[in-house]
Amino acid sequence: MKRVVISLGGSIISMEKLNLEFMEEFSRMLGNIKGYDGFGIVVGGGKLARTYISDLRKYNVNDNILDEIGINATRINALAMTTFLDDVNSKIPTTVNDAAEMMHDYRYVVMGGTEPGHTTDTVAMLFAERINADVMINGTSVDGVYTEDPRKNRNAKKIDRMNYDDAIKLSIENSIGAGSNVFMDITSLSIAKRSGIKIFVINGLKIDEYINILYNGTCNGTIIE
């Protein structure tokens, strides 16, 4: 079975408003892809999650509840994505195992977060591991992995290829300090390493990137393997 998992960052799904144009274009692109048995799609929370969390934090709402709110925001975005796809689940799974079971019934299975402490990148990697996918595509708001956050340092350099250990090391370095911005969390990268899942980190808004990866195994972002 040839399957791929795609992680769509919340920043490209839910910006100032829900990015319906992207959802439609992305779904149309997947519908035209041949040679694959199924796609797992994991969706982030984006502006919807950030708005709820930042507003409620002012009222000292505890972190566990904020985590649950963030998770439910990802599931709302996931449900919105399903409306643009055919042969897709209508109920959003709450666990990776449930999502994997749905792959037997649908070509596309869309989900959000699962539990506090797990980012949607980690969920996507666990999903990929569970369904024996060789590839996870991480659609982000930047066009790959950089030595530093390119939005803060114009001298940051993009990395075309890196191994798992170097990616984990960079993730740790990026997670230190105020206002840190991590391209992928350590847990997701560690799962990829143990299962040999190749990661493509790309600008998720560029539809051609998905096509190049799925047909040619190439991208203009960063490949981690």
UniProtKB/Swiss-Prot annotation:
Activity: how regulated: Inhibited by UTP.
Pathway involvement of the protein, from the record: Pyrimidine metabolism; CTP biosynthesis via de novo pathway; UDP from UMP (UMPK route): step 1/1
Any GO BP: 'de novo' CTP biosynthetic process
Binding site for UMP: G45, D67, T114, E115, P116, G117, H118, T119, T120
Keywords linked to the UniProt accession: ATP-binding, Cytoplasm, Kinase, Nucleotide-binding, Pyrimidine biosynthesis, Transferase
GO cellular component: cytoplasm
Binding-site list for ATP: G10, S11, G46, R50, T140, Y146, D149
Primary location: cytoplasm
A molecular function (GO) term: ATP binding
Enzyme Commission code: 2.7.4.22
Subcellular location(s) per record: Cytoplasm
InterPro entries, alphabetized: AceGlu_kinase-like_sf, Asp/Glu/Uridylate_kinase, Uridylate_kinase, Uridylate_kinase_arch/spir
Reaction equation(s) it catalyzes: UMP + ATP = UDP + ADP
Assembly: Homohexamer.
Protein purpose: Catalyzes the reversible phosphorylation of UMP to UDP.
Family listed: Belongs to the UMP kinase family.
Name this protein carries in UniProt: Uridylate kinase
Naturally occurring in which organism (per UniProt): Picrophilus torridus (strain ATCC 700027 / DSM 9790 / JCM 10055 / NBRC 100828 / KAW 2/3)
